[in-house]
Each structure stands twice: as structure tokens, then as C-alpha cells.
């Protein structure tokens, strides 16, 4: 039932958007070396998002990007749902996009539930038509982090433009 509700909520965005892409990323540090909290290399921390693009205005366009994150961290799994809004600047350098977003949402970890906020800076390089690699710098405020003010993660991922 939840899936049907989500589909009906997304239909207006799908029909009004000027383009849709799918993003899949992994936290680079957790994938390669682990972290100081005891998570080893190859720790799963996957983000999946859908990007709905607005009309192109000059060198940029507005976007909305809902995301889901799952991380199998030491001490407990993390689930996050986020709604991001921002701008992509795609006319400065050929085949390169620069995206700035702000967002917020809900998370669940250690039997804790709560809100989080985040800011992202993303650079995408399109190596072929409709497929690109991106680096995403994320600054996030989460209740489950020891430093509850701001945490940082660097993600690497792939973006596929569907239309």
C-alpha cells in the first residue's frame, strides 16, 4: 500500500519535470579504508536517488532529488530518507555538471528516529551520452553521530539520465 501511495505522490513530479535521472552512490571512505568508528573497508553505505529536473534557465536548472540511504554500520544499520532541492550548473564546462543542494529528512538507527539536515556539492562528468560519474561532498547533521553538529562524507557514484 505504501508503494502505491508513493507512486501517486510522484506522478505530478514525473509529468512536470523536464528530465529524470537515477543516482546510485557509495561512501568512498567506507568502501576503501573504513573509518575511526570501527567500520572496516568494504562497509556497505549505499544511496539511491531520483533526480527531477526543472526548466533550463540560462546556465542552470532547479532540481528535486528524493534519496534513500542504507548503511550496514558497526553497532547498527542506518536508514535515511531525504528530500533535496537545489540547482545544477551545466553550461560552464562541456560534459560537466556542478550541483548544489540542501535537504532534510528522517533517519533510523540504534532504535533512534529523528530528523537530519544536509548540504551537498556534487560534480558529475558525463563520459557518454546520458551516463556520468559523480563525486558528492555531503555535510550532514545527524542525531546518531558523536559530533551532532556536522559530519562529512565523500561519495562516488553513477548517474543515468532516463529522459
Where are these regions (language model features)?
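Short beta-strand micro-motifs in enzyme catalytic cores
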Residues: 40-42, 77-79, 115, 150-152
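Sec-dependent N-terminal signal peptides
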Residues: 3-14
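Hydrophobic transmembrane alpha-helix bundles
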Residues: 29-31, 96-109, 134-141
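Gram-negative (and chloroplast) outer-membrane scaffold detector with strong preference
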Residues: 47-117, 125-127, 160-163
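Short glycine/proline- and aromatic-enriched beta-strand/turn motifs that initiate or cap beta-hairpins
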Residues: 16-63, 68, 155-163
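Intrinsically disordered, low-complexity peptide-like regions
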Residues: 4, 21-25, 64-66, 82, ...
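Predominantly the C-terminal beta-signal and adjacent terminal strand-loop region
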Residues: 22, 32-38, 68-70, 119-163
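Intrinsically disordered/low-complexity terminal segments and short unstructured peptides
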Residues: 2, 24, 98-100, 123
